[in-house]
């Protein structure tokens, strides 16, 4: 018995020593930042300068790798099942919260991923074609009550999908969901009028609105955007509590050593203070919300529970 305990003690000591040595040498090779969304979207745009700034803080290259698909779940699962050595990270967004309730997953992000740091939030805009007869939100709902209306999304269980489902549910109308591989892929059909409406994050939507090709008829934030001061919030339009937006944060496999987790957290928070990242966040109308890992992890679980509650109450139902 004593011999078995002794062997076990040696094994535990060896593991702890190896982990400590690994943390002391970290990072000694490039770090991969997986972006599980389509190229050209807000996550892709924000992840690049943040990765560069993190690399400068760590003294090692941090490069981005796009792994889109299934509303972000393919890339998230890849990271969740990667070695927990700090060399594979996830640049996550809202879909990491919503997928728990609205998608069939082969992993559980709540237990298989560890929050490293929170980054920012970004409001969304409800858009219709610039050529559409729909001039405001009331027009949209009236149209939905008398004819076929559809809406595009950046993919199943993404924010743009669930916001559309929430409008459909609360307006008690029938709206068909048409998923795309990223919001950018949906714009040609929206502009041409083949899609009735869609939600997109402010940074991606604003150039399209300013060009006149699409029309903004509502925003999802609690107050009007300074970039679109004439566009009402959904709260104003009779949809109280519709304060939903897209968040961004960084995660790692859950078994990552604490020392490495702390180094990454410091690097993310340092990156958020660099002029390059500050300017990039401002360019897409994102609000910086730096959060340490423990705080961000708690917030993430609360956000996940919020969507789970909406699913349970039937406030949001996924039709396809």
Name each model feature, range by range.
Residues 23-112, 148-150, 156, 160, ...:
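N-terminal (or domain-start) structured segment
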Residues 28-30, 169, 258-320:
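An extracytoplasmic/periplasmic, membrane-proximal ligand-sensing/linker region
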Residues 95-104, 166-170, 197-231, 308:
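A ligand-binding cleft/hinge motif common to bilobed small-molecule-binding domains
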Residues 121, 205-273, 302-305, 319:
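C-terminal lobe and pocket-closing loops
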């Amino acid at each position: 018995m004593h011999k078995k305990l002794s062997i076990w003690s040696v094994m535990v000591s060896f593991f702890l020593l190896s982990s400590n040595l690994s943390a002391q040498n970290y990072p000694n090779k490039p770090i991969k930042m997986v972006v599980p969304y389509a190229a050209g979207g807000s996550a892709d745009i924000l992840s690049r300068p943040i990765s560069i700034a993190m690399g400068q803080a760590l003294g090692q290259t941090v490069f981005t790798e796009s792994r889109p698909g299934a509303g972000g779940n393919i890339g998230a699962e890849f990271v969740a099942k990667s070695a927990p050595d700090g060399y594979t990270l996830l640049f996550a967004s809202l879909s990491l919260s919503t997928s728990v309730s609205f998608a069939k997953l082969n992993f559980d992000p709540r237990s298989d991923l560890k929050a490293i740091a929170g980054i920012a939030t970004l409001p969304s805009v409800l858009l219709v074609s610039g050529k559409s007869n729909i001039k405001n939100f009331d027009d949209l709902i009236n149209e939905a009550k008398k004819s076929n209306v559809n809406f595009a999304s950046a993919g199943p269980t993404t924010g743009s999908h669930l916001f559309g489902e929430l409008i459909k549910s609360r307006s008690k109308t029938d709206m068909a969901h048409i998923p795309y591989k990223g919001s950018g892929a949906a714009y040609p059909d929206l502009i041409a009028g083949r899609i009735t409406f869609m939600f997109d994050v402010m940074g991606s939507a604003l150039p399209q609105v300013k060009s006149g090709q699409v029309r903004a008829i509502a925003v999802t934030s609690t107050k009007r955007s300074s970039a679109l001061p004439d566009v009402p919030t959904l709260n104003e339009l009779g949809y109280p509590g519709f304060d939903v937006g897209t968040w961004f944060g960084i995660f790692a496999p859950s078994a990552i050593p604490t020392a490495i987790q702390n180094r990454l957290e410091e690097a993310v928070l340092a990156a958020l203070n660099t002029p390059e990242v500050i300017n990039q966040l401002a360019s897409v109308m994102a609000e910086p919300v730096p959060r340490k890992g423990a705080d961000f992890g708690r917030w993430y679980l609360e956000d996940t529970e919020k969507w789970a509650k909406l699913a349970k109450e039937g406030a949001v139902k996924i039709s396809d």
